Structures are given as structure tokens and as C-alpha cells.
């Protein structure tokens, strides 16, 4: 029944999704304003959702142009469906323009198809189809739309300051059958705060180093600019050998007497950096072989001592595991250095329940002082957990099982979704076990089958939660 309903809307679903995907809704603080708190792209994507909602007869409510909601249903209780329309930067290496959606026979290719514009449109159409069926709603629905999920969650922070907290809810921003727990997440900077003068003339001086754009992405590109006093050819040959030994792609060029070294890695979501290749950490590993100036040497040595080849916090003394949520993970998402302001490592750390986060951070902060570094802590989100046997969770899982015959149990993840904003919130789709996960990677795509099947599952789930008694 549900799949047949969705079939009637397939062309509309694709057209509305294409319109949303064409908006480059990457956070841009340089263009932020009161009317566009995280830049014009995210604001435009939020407005787009309002426009299709108004077209279809829904009421909307805007919250300072950074978040808002589409309203449906009636009743005392509220089901929240928490989506986001911002995306991470596209990065390089795409086979097509990431903001000009390509629709093939069986897929749609663009930044945001999986994370989270495709699932957002799927959830929206589930609500729209039920509304078109004139169902007898027993709950209200607030489809809450954020514009800063990929960065600081300013959107939901602002939204929940003044707006009604849903009784229960889900975020269509992960996998099926259901994610009932999420690790704690924090970002922090390790800042080089002690600079020293060189007593002797160094053979090499690190002028600048840059790798990574986002804390929650493994950097796939790194560039170092090095002033080489002698043996330029030897350094280039050593670098080429290093790339070969580590199965890496990279390049070396000379620009006005400065040696420019680049390394290409593999970008993946920061919740599991072990499956990516951190270009920045590898390039620092090579630089450690050079007799650099003191400050650069301290920066490079710090990376090798605490960060390189340590995806689970081992070198930071933070290795920890639980059977329910798994391991601590540490992603070094941003690395910068220049010879005037020294260096910075931007870390995204995720931790399971039971990990003594504050104690671990205090110990680490004290330890790294001796190497001229300090911790600057950002936002901390504690772990989030809902019992998988809760009737709400079971209704979602039943809808999934009815349509897939897949009896996989709900599980927990290292990723963070809007679900953690709610006391009773879980992540629910829209990826299936056979979906290729290219979130935060080049050539991100969603299959039409996945898009329509997710819509159908959301349709049944929302019906069981908000229409049936």
C-alpha cells in the first residue's frame, strides 16, 4: 500500500529534491548577517523548504532565519522530525558539478543527496502524502529544519530556546533500522602557544601548512610551503619515496624559491577516521624527517607524538571502549601553521557512555603544556541513549521491517544527529545496509530506490505514530 502511494509522487519528489540540491548551502561566516546567520546559502535552502510547504498548503514558522518548522496534524503531543539543509563543502575531485544535480536512470548525484537533503525531502513527502490522504491526525507534527548541523548546531540551540520541545521524534540523518544511541561529541583546538628563536640557522623553514576544512571530516588534501636552504633535489626525491612507501598521491613544485609539497588523502566522516586517509598528518610525518626551524619542529613532533596513526585516542591516553557504543575516536580535521602565528590542530573527539571526558581532558591538557601546547575546548555534547525496547522505537522498527523483511536490531553510532536534542529522539534512516555511504565525500549520491523506499517507510512510521491510536 505505502509503496504504491509513493509511486504516484516520484516525479515530484525528484524535482523538489533537485531544487534543494542546487542550492550551495555551505556555511559561510564571511557573508553571515542578521538575515542569514550562517551565510546566504543555508538561508536560501531554509526558504526553499518554506516555499514548497506553502505551495502544498502547510503552515510554517521561522526562527531568526537560522531554523524553522513545517507544521501538520493536530493533537496534544508533537512528533518532531529533525532535518537539516546545510551541507559540508564539496571538496575536489567530483565527476560533475556537486551543486548541479545529475539524475541518471537509477540515482541522483550531488552534494547533500544523502546528508541530509534527500532524507529531508523523503520525510517531507511522507507528511504531504498523509495530508493528501486526509487522515485523521492524533498528533501534531513539527518538521524542524536546521541550517548549521554540520558545524556548531547554532540552529537547534536557537530553536529550542523558545520553541516547543517535541514529545518524541526522529532525525532522518543516519541509517535504518534505527539508531537509538549516539556517542558524546566535542571539538577542541590544540594551540601552539610557546614560540622560540632559533640559535642556529635551520636547513629548512616551514612557512605555512594547511590541511582540512571541517572538524568532522578527515582532510583529503594538505599543503606545506618550505623554505629550503640547500639540497632541494634531495628533499624532493625523499618526498617522492615517502609517497611511494605510504601508497599516497602527492606533488612537489617550486614557487619563487619556496618548495610546495602536497599530499592527497581520503576524506570520510569524522566519526570513523580509521577508514579515511588523513593527508595532513601524513605530510607532517614527512616534514619530521627535515631539520626544520624550532617552532615547526615542535609542531611536527607534537603531531607524531600524539596524533599520527592514532584514530582511537591511543597516543592521547584516551583509548576507551564499551560494548554498547564502541570506541573513543579522534579525528584531526583541521591543521594550520604559519611561521608568525605558530600552529593549531582542530580535533573532533567522540566518546561512549562511561568515558570520563573532563578527567581525561584535564590530564591531557596538563601533559601537553611541556611541549608548548594548550587545549581550547569548544562545544561538548554528552552521549545520548534511548532504550531500543521503548514502544516508540519499536513502532519505527516495525515500519521498517514490514517493508524490508530485514530483522536487524537497532544499534548505536559514533555520529551525531539532531535526535540528541530530544529526550526521546532517535535517528531513523535514510540509509539502508546496501547503500554506499559517500556522506562528506566526492560524488555523493542517493539511488532512486533508496529515496522512494525511505519515503514509504517514513509514511508507514508516521501513520502508526500520529494517525493510529
Curated annotation (Swiss-Prot):
What domain of life does the native source organism fall in?
Bacteria
Cofactor info, note text: Binds 2 Zn(2+) ions per subunit.
Q: Which InterPro entries match?
A: Bact_exopeptidase_dim_dom (IPR036264), M20A_pepV-rel (IPR010964), Peptidase_M20 (IPR002933), Peptidase_M20A (IPR050072)
GO MF? acetylornithine deacetylase activity; dipeptidase activity; metallopeptidase activity; zinc ion binding
- Enzyme Commission identifier(s): 3.4.13.-
The residues that hold Zn(2+) 2 are 84, 115, 173
Which residues participate directly in catalysis? 86, 149 (proton acceptor)
Cofactor(s), by name: Zn(2+)
Residues holding Zn(2+) 1: 115, 150, 440
Q: Which GO terms describe its biological process?
A: L-arginine biosynthetic process; proteolysis
Instruction: State the UniProt keywords alphabetically.
Output: Dipeptidase, Hydrolase, Metal-binding, Metalloprotease, Protease, Zinc
Q: Which family does it belong to?
A: Belongs to the peptidase M20A family.
Any idea what this protein is called?
Putative dipeptidase SACOL1801
Species assigned in the record: Staphylococcus aureus (strain COL)
Question: What broad taxonomic lineage does this protein's source fall under?
Answer: Bacteria, Bacillati, Bacillota, Bacilli, Bacillales
Amino acid at each position: 500500500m505505502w509503496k504504491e502511494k509513493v509511486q504516484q509522487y516520484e516525479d515530484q519528489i525528484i524535482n523538489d529534491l533537485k531544487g534543494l540540491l542546487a542550492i550551495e548551502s555551505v556555511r559561510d561566516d564571511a557573508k553571515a548577517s542578521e538575515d542569514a546567520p550562517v551565510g546566504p546559502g543555508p538561508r536560501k535552502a531554509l526558504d526553499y523548504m518554506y516555499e514548497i510547504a506553502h505551495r502544498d498548503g502547510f503552515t510554517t514558522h521561522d526562527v531568526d532565519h537560522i531554523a524553522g518548522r513545517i507544521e501538520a496534524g493536530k493533537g496534544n503531543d508533537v512528533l518532531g522530525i529533525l532535518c537539516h539543509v546545510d551541507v559540508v563543502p564539496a571538496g575536489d575531485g567530483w565527476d560533475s558539478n556537486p551543486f548541479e544535480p545529475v539524475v541518471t536512470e537509477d540515482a541522483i548525484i550531488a552534494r547533500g543527496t544523502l546528508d541530509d537533503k534527500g532524507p529531508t525531502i523523503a520525510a517531507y513527502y511522507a507528511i504531504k502524502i498523509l495530508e493528501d490522504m486526509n487522515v485523521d491526525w492524533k498528533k501534531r507534527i513539527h518538521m524542524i529544519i536546521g541550517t548549521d548541523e554540520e558545524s556548531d548546531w547554532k540552529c537547534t540551540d536557537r530553536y529550542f530556546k523558545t520553541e516547543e520541545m517535541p514529545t518524541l521524534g526522529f532525525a532522518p540523518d543516519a541509517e535504518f533500522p534505527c539508531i537509538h544511541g549516539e556517542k558524546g561529541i566535542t571539538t577542541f583546538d590544540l594551540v601552539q602557544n610557546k614560540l622560540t628563536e632559533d640559535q642556529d640557522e635551520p636547513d629548512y623553514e616551514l612557512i605555512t601548512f594547511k590541511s582540512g576544512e571541517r572538524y568532522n571530516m578527515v582532510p583529503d588534501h594538505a599543503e606545506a610551503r618550505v623554505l629550503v636552504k640547500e639540497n632541494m633535489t634531495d628533499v624532493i626525491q625523499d618526498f617522492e619515496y615517502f609517497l611511494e612507501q605510504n601508497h599516497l598521491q602527492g606533488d612537489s613544485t617550486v614557487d619563487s624559491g619556496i618548495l610546495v609539497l602536497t599530499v592527497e588523502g581520503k576524506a570520510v566522516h569524522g566519526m570513523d577516521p580509521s577508514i579515511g586517509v588523513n593527508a595532513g598528518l601524513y605530510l607532517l610525518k614527512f616534514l619530521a624527517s627535515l631539520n626544520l626551524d624550532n617552532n615547526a619542529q615542535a609542531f611536527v613532533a607534537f603531531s607524531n607524538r600524539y596524533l599520527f596513526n592514532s584514530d582511537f585516542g591511543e597516543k592521547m591516553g584516551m583509548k576507551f571502549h564499551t560494548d554498547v557504543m564502541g570506541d573513543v575516536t579522534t579525528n584531526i580535521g583541521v591543521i594550520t601553521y604559519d611561521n608568525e602565528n605558530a600552529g593549531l590542530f582542530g580535533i573532533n573527539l567522540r566518546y561512549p557512555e562511561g568515558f570520563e571526558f573532563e578527567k581525561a581532558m584535564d590530564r591531557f591538557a596538563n601533559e601537553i603544556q611541556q611541549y608548548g601546547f594548550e587545549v581550547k575546548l569548544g562545544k561538548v555534547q554528552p552521549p545520548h541513549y534511548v532504550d531500543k525496547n521503548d514502544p516508540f522505537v519499536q513502532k519505527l522498527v516495525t515500519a521498517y521491517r514490514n517493508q524490508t523483511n530485514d530483522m536487524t536490531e537497532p544499534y548505536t553510532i559514533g555520529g551525531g544527529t539532531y535526535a540528541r536534542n530530544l529526550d526521546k529522539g532517535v535517528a531513523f534512516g535514510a540509509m539502508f545496509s546496501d547503500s554506499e555511504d559517500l556522506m562528506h565525500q566526492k560524488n555523493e549520491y542517493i539511488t532512486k530506490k533508496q529515496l522512494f523506499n525511505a519515503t514509504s517507510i517514513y509514511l508507514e512510521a508516521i501513520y502508526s505514530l500520529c494517525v493510529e491510536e
